[in-house]
UniProtKB/Swiss-Prot annotation:
SMART domains, per the entry: CAD
Post-translational modification: Caspase-3 cleaves DFF45 at 2 sites to generate an active factor.
Site (Cleavage): D117, S118, D224, T225
Residues where N-acetylmethionine is found: M1
Example of a GO MF term: deoxyribonuclease inhibitor activity
UniProt source species: Homo sapiens
Sites of Phosphoserine modification: S315
Name of the protein this chain belongs to: DNA fragmentation factor subunit alpha
């Protein structure tokens, strides 16, 4: 928004642009929303709103995310709206705190660890950071990761991604759509499988297949039992991957792209033994995983290409200089 300034930095009658910002002290997670036209204006409001004693000035403003010192008005104007700042008094130092994934809470002796930063809380934050670095990674995430982001509190996810709650709500809606699309594909495949099974029963193909499987099983028991046991120990897939392959319908839709790649590289015979499947079923699932992986990679490459084209059209004449970093507390 724009208002006419009557005091401070701008002269009388001069139009100034106010940037909405979020401020907090180093000892509190309570933050305040302010609007400032420049850094000096933001420092002044920080002293007033956060009750910083004048004897502790000058106040240093750093980005709450990584401790970058913001002391240049041009850089300040380039920051997005609702950027989070930490106001440091003259006797305070910023310190990176890994427990909250770089949200940059300042270290204090009386700091209480947030319970949501442990266990599942850390896991969804790690996934959120991956999404923050590259939005197209949505395509590569597993259903479990997608569901964690959908279930994450909107305000916490907005803070982690440095976006507004409205933007994050739209993102969570998109993530839910991705989950719904995968479920629709899974149900379609299930219906197709049921249809094929009905055809097999109708044509007496199923009984012949069972006889063939029984004969094959007896031969394996008589000849290759020792080899099969030895082969099963060679499977390097994690337990959650094997569980998904055994229990999920269309398991390729449940796994992340990294897991899909591991499945496609696994030896079919060893995987068949580990899953207690026949070779044909194992190879069919591996082929489905390979197709799903290729589709996701193709979609990701397409997004990257579109992003590169958009960036080249809207690239600024020059890059910002590397900002300085606040020195970290050695403790």
């Amino acid at each position: 928004m724009e208002v006419t300034g009557d005091a401070g930095v701008p002269e009388s009658g001069e139009i100034r642009t106010l940037k909405p910002c979020l401020l907090r002290r180093n000892y509190s997670r309570e933050q305040h929303g302010v609007a400032a036209s420049c850094l000096e204006d933001l420092r002044s409001k920080a002293c007033d709103i956060l009750a910083i004693d004048k004897s502790l000035t000058p106040v240093t403003l750093v980005l709450a995310e990584d401790g970058t010192i913001v002391d240049d008005d041009d850089y300040f104007l380039c920051l997005p709206s609702n950027t989070k700042f930490v106001a440091l008094a003259s006797n305070e130092k910023w310190a990176y705190n890994n427990s909250d994934g770089g949200t940059a809470w300042i270290s204090q002796e009386s700091f209480d660890v947030d319970e949501t930063d442990s266990g599942a809380g850390l896991k969804w934050k790690n996934v959120a950071r991956q999404l923050k670095e590259d939005l197209s990674s949505i395509i590569l995430l597993s259903e479990e990761d997608l569901q964690m982001l959908v279930d994450a509190p909107c305000s916490d996810l907005a803070q982690e991604l440095r976006q507004s709650c409205a933007t994050v709500q739209r993102l969570q809606h998109t993530l839910q759509q991705v989950l719904d699309q995968r479920e629709e594909v899974r149900q379609s495949k299930q219906l197709l499988q049921l249809y094929l099974q009905a055809l097999e029963k109708e044509g007496s193909l199923l009984s012949k297949q069972e006889e063939s499987k029984a004969a094959f099983g007896e031969e394996v028991d008589a000849v290759d039992t020792g080899i099969s046991r030895e082969t099963s120990s060679d499977v390097a897939l994690a337990s959650h991957i094997l569980t998904a392959l055994r229990e999920k319908q269309a398991p390729e839709l449940s796994l992340s792209s990294q897991d899909l790649e591991l499945v496609t590289k696994e030896d079919p015979k060893a995987l068949a033994v580990a899953l207690n499947w026949d070779i044909k079923k194992t190879e069919t699932v591996q082929e489905a995983c390979e197709r799903e992986l290729a589709l996701r990679l193709q979609q990701t490459q397409s997004l990257h290409s579109l992003r590169s084209i958009s960036a080249s059209k809207a690239s600024p004449p020059g890059d910002l200089q590397n900002p300085k970093r606040a020195r970290q507390d050695p403790t």
